[in-house]
Structure formats: C-alpha cells, structure tokens
Curated annotation (Swiss-Prot):
PANTHER family: AMINOGLYCOSIDE PHOSPHOTRANSFERASE DOMAIN-CONTAINING PROTEIN (PTHR21064:SF6), AMINOGLYCOSIDE PHOSPHOTRANSFERASE DOMAIN-CONTAINING PROTEIN-RELATED (PTHR21064)
Keyword Kinase: yes
Pfam family, one: APH
Name of the protein: Homoserine kinase
The protein's annotated pathway: Amino-acid biosynthesis; L-threonine biosynthesis; L-threonine from L-aspartate: step 4/5
Keyword annotations: Amino-acid biosynthesis, ATP-binding, Kinase, Nucleotide-binding, Threonine biosynthesis, Transferase
Gene: thrB
Lineage: Bacteria, Pseudomonadati, Pseudomonadota, Betaproteobacteria, Burkholderiales
Uppermost EC category: transferase
E.C. numbers: 2.7.1.39
SUPFAM superfamilies found in the cross-reference section: Protein kinase-like (PK-like)
Organism: Ralstonia pickettii (strain 12J)
C-alpha cells in the first residue's frame, strides 16, 4: 500500500456522500506497499465509530477490478476472514475518486507479525487451504497478472540494469520457468483463485486474551489475486513466512508447520510434491522481477517505499542451489 494519488479531507467527505457510513472522523494515507493509493478511514454513525480502508487503484482497470472485489465478497460469505467491500447507496462497490477506480472495504482487526511463530505459520497454512477450497465455485475468472506472460514482458526492460551473475540468473531462470510452465505436469496442477501476495504484512492476528489462543484476524490486500496454481500461492507464502531473512534458507519448523496444516485441509497431489522446488523458484522469481522493475523503473508516489530487490535474488539463488526439494509432508499411518 502507498499513496500515489492524494485525496483531501474535503474530497473524501464529498465522495462518502455516496455511502451510508457516517461522518468522517479521521483520514490518513498508508505508507507501506507499492501498488495502490490506500487510506485508513474512521467514521462515526449513530454514536459508534467504524474503521475502513479506502483504496484508489493506480494500475488495475474498471474491467479487471470486479474479479478482486467480488472474490473478497465471495470468500467473506464462505467464512474466510477478509475485508468486505462496502456498497454505496446505489449498491455499487466500485466507483471513481479523483479520476481513479476506488472502493471502500472493512478494516480487519489485529496486527501483522513480521517475526511469525511456528504456531502462526500453521494457522496461516490452515486458512490458506480453506481459502483455496472456498474459491472453487467462484464464477469469475482472471489470471494472475504477474505470472509468466508478465515476466516475459518485463524482464527485457530490467536486464540492462543488471550485470554478470545477476543477469545470468535473471535470464536462465526465465528460461527454466518457460519450460516448466509448458510442461504437461504443470498443466495438471490443481488451480483456482489465489491471493498471490500473502506476505506477513498482508495477514493480521488478534492478540491472545484471558487465556485464549491467538486468533487469525484475516487476510487482506487481494489486489494481486488471480487464478493460478494453488501450489504457487503456497510457495509465495512459504518464501516469506518460513525463511531466515538474512540467508533466504527455509526454516524447517515453520515450513513443516505451514505445509502440514495446509495438507490436513487440502492434501497435496503427487505432482505438487514433485514440483515443489520448481514452484518455490517461480515464487521467488516473480517477486525478484517485480522488485527489480519497481527499483529501476519507479513511478512517482507521495509515500512510496520500494523494496530491496536483492532479497528475492538471494532467496532464488538459495532455491536453485538447494538440491532436490520436495514437500515435507506427514507420512501415512501404518
């Protein structure tokens, strides 16, 4: 999240006349992230305060956005804790603000944990599997817009900025992924709506209280979602939640907790087990490419904080050089 398109207090107040959410009490930009303009909104209605997030979409179009917004609505209706889009007085959940497509959604309770525990990794794995199953009957279809076709388009633009071993890795991994995506095994992998960006800062936990265990507040920021292989979504999540940040090496306990919890809800197929390493590489490559793109070909933004691209270069090198990796799953009982 970030602020590319500013919105004044007067502009948001006028825009909110189209909604029945009450009077504005606080409105501020959210500095984290790199894709859309986001704001926290507090309103008061009938003596009660309500918390929302307002998003202006900088790249996604009116034609693309219904997939994301109605997916969130669909998941919320299937007991997956996600932000719910708020309809206006006319029933619409998407409209224009300062020349950009915009929406307002509920703000989830809780906080992100950037140093997740083994238990939290298990909680996320369980809910990710439930989210995948809940999305099976979602009727809309839109591919992951940051998958291979986008890599093919963007990599030639960033190659001139990198050199030596880094350029070789960028080009060689693209060739590897092109072969993998063209394979019959890849085509057979199960798929459906995926979050595609389930990093630690896109998940909230509500703190434990009165002896109760910590609970999941929810998943948010679905604006990179798309129909993709479920295993890709798992790999993206593991590559962020279950690694040593300094080296990119997978942490055995956290990885096992996430995979076992996921597998208990939606068992992995044999093909998924065989191609775990390929998908870990694909997930690392996707974010390395996007961070190179944002770093070397940046857009203007009031509060933009581009991510360091070398982090996912390090993760990718670790996945490529780790030897054969398969899913570490529970063994069947005899």
């Amino acid at each position: 999240m970030a602020v590319f398109t500013p919105v004044s207090d007067a502009e948001i107040a006028l825009w909110l006349d189209q909604y029945d959410v009450g009077a504005v009490r606080a409105f501020r930009g959210i500095p984290s992230g790199i894709e859309n303009s986001n704001f926290f909104l507090t309103t008061e209605k009938d003596g009660q305060t309500h918390e929302y997030v307002v998003t202006l979409f900088e790249r996604l179009t009116f034609e693309q956005l219904p997939f994301y917004l109605y997916l969130m609505q669909h998941l919320a209706q299937h007991d997956i804790s996600v932000p719910a889009p708020i309809p206006g007085r006319d029933g619409e959940i998407l409209r224009t603000l300062n020349g950009k497509p915009a929406t307002i959604v509920t703000r989830l309770a809780g906080r992100s944990n950037l140093a997740p525990t083994v238990s939290e990794c298990g909680i996320v794995g369980d809910m990710l599997a439930r989210m995948h199953l809940a999305g099976r009957d979602y009727p809309r279809h839109q591919p992951n817009l940051r998958s291979l076709p986008w890599w093919n388009e963007v990599v030639p633009d960033v190659v001139p900025f990198v050199h030596g071993d880094t350029r070789a890795l960028l080009e060689n991994e693209l060739a590897h992924q092109q072969r993998f995506f063209a394979s019959a095994d890849y085509a057979a992998l199960p798929e459906g709506p995926c979050h595609c960006d389930l990093f630690r800062d896109n998940v909230l936990f509500e703190p434990a209280a009165d002896g109760q265990p910590e609970r999941l507040g929810g998943f948010f920021d679905f604006y990179f979602a798309g129909v993709d292989k479920w295993l890709f979504d798992v790999a993206v999540t593991v590559n962020d939640w279950c690694i040593d940040l300094a080296t990119g090496v997978l942490d055995t306990e956290r990885t096992r907790a996430m995979l076992h919890a996921y597998h208990a809800v939606r068992p992995f197929t044999d093909a998924e087990t065989r191609h775990w390493q390929d998908m870990l590489r694909a997930a690392a490559y996707r974010f390395w490419v996007s961070r190179l793109w944002d770093f070397y070909l940046p857009r203007d933004a009031e509060l933009l904080k581009p991510h360091d691209p070398t982090h996912f270069e390090r993760v990718l090198r670790e996945r490529v050089g780790a030897g054969a990796l398969t899913l570490d799953l529970p063994q069947p009982c005899n």
